[in-house]
């Protein structure tokens, strides 16, 4: 049996992971990360609930204080991208640098052979000795999109015990069976450091000024005024405050000129994208190849052609044009249920662009 550290967020998923591994006879250590100063230290917080579950299971529990690192690596990056008119996904960066970076280092320092998390994803090892990341049995909860940037070195040191569990109801049933205090606790919010998922309020609290500017039609006409580019996202329709013969959508966020560009629905469709900072879990099969990709978490994989470019970039051409390709989000490539790799969406491409 192994000495395994479990990333315990105080939620149902990671608590069940700890209980399952203990049931299997492993020596389990609980680690809870404190990433930002909580509003309280009582019930419902990761530190409290993680420690409570660890005490129930009779396992050691460690609180890892990472507030300065999380601020520097994740929150400041998030704010900077919004300043540039992009729509970031901080969870992907957090997984690579924090959970499977600093937390994994702490697990090794505590003598753990492996780090286990409550992610819904599967990791297998192929005949070639390479680790493969695959979608979870529970497709509705699959989190493989968020882990595309993990390296082989990271994947060799982690396990995902919930990857084969078919439903969240089954996880909750296990939590109840283990008598865990968090068995009925709700799922966590989308971005952990943004209170009430109010992005605009958070960004303004962090120093981004709500600078009004023009809302411009793709044809060039000034149609109205916006209340700050950080308050808008690609594909947004509601809240524009514009009367027009057809529904209008946000097509572009130009923070350098303080403009929001809008247009009719057909202008949201893009033929492809340019990806940057591309990384691969397994080597790409060729410099140009067909596969499928997701351009946001809840997007269904769509057929595409990938062309590798210099400087860890790539061009992606969709078989059918896709709606709301958003700079700052991520494109992740799949071959059937296997994650190949991915990268940050740098720009959307129309059919006329090279």
UniProtKB/Swiss-Prot annotation:
Residues 141-143, 296-297 are annotated as: Interaction with tRNA. Signal peptide: none annotated. Disulfide bonds join 94-192. Its EC number is 2.8.1.13. ATP binds at residues 7-14, 33, 118. The record marks 119, 329 as: Interaction with tRNA. GO terms for cellular component: cytoplasm. Transmembrane segments: none annotated. It catalyses: S-sulfanyl-L-cysteinyl-[protein] + uridine(34) in tRNA + AH2 + ATP = 2-thiouridine(34) in tRNA + L-cysteinyl-[protein] + A + AMP + diphosphate + H(+). Keywords: ATP-binding, Cytoplasm, Disulfide bond, Nucleotide-binding, RNA-binding, Transferase, tRNA processing, tRNA-binding. The active site is at residues 94, 192. This is tRNA-specific 2-thiouridylase MnmA. It comes from Trichlorobacter lovleyi (strain ATCC BAA-1151 / DSM 17278 / SZ) (Geobacter lovleyi).
């Amino acid at each position: 049996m192994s000495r395994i550290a479990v990333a315990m967020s105080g939620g149902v998923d990671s608590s069940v992971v700890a209980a399952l591994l203990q049931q299997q006879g492993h020596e389990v250590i609980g680690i809870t990360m404190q990433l930002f100063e909580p509003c309280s230290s009582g019930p419902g917080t990761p530190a409290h609930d993680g420690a409570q579950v660890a005490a129930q299971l009779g396992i050691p529990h460690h609180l890892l204080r990472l507030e300065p690192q999380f601020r520097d690596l994740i929150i400041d990056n998030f704010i900077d991208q919004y300043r540039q008119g992009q729509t970031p996904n901080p969870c992907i960066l957090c997984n690579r640098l924090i959970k499977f970076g600093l937390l994994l280092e702490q697990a090794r320092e505590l003598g753990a052979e492996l780090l286990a998390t409550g992610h819904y994803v599967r990791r297998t090892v192929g005949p070639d000795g390479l680790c493969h990341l695959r979608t979870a049995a529970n497709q509705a909860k699959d989190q493989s999109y968020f882990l595309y940037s993990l390296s082989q070195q990271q994947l060799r040191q982690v396990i995902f015990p919930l990857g084969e569990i078919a439903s969240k109801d089954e996880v909750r049933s296990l939590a109840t069976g283990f008598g865990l205090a968090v068995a009925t606790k709700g799922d966590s919010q989308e971005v952990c450091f943004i209170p009430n998922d109010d992005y605009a309020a958070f960004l303004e609290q962090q120093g981004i000024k709500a600078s009004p500017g023009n809302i411009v039609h793709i044809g060039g006409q000034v149609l109205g005024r916006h209340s700050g580019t950080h308050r808008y996202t690609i594909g947004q329709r509601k809240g524009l405050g514009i009367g027009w013969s057809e529904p209008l959508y946000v097509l572009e966020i130009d923070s350098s000129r303080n403009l929001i560009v809008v247009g009719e629905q057909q202008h949201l469709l893009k033929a492809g994208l340019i990806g940057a900072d591309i990384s691969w879990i397994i080597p790409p099969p060729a410099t140009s190849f067909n596969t499928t990709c997701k351009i946001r978490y809840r997007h269904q994989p769509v057929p595409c052609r990938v062309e590798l470019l210099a400087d860890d970039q790539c061009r992606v051409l969709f078989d059918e044009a896709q709606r709301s390709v958003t700079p700052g989000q991520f494109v992740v490539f799949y071959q059937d249920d296997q994650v190949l790799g991915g990268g940050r969406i740098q720009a959307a491409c129309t059919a006329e662009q090279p």
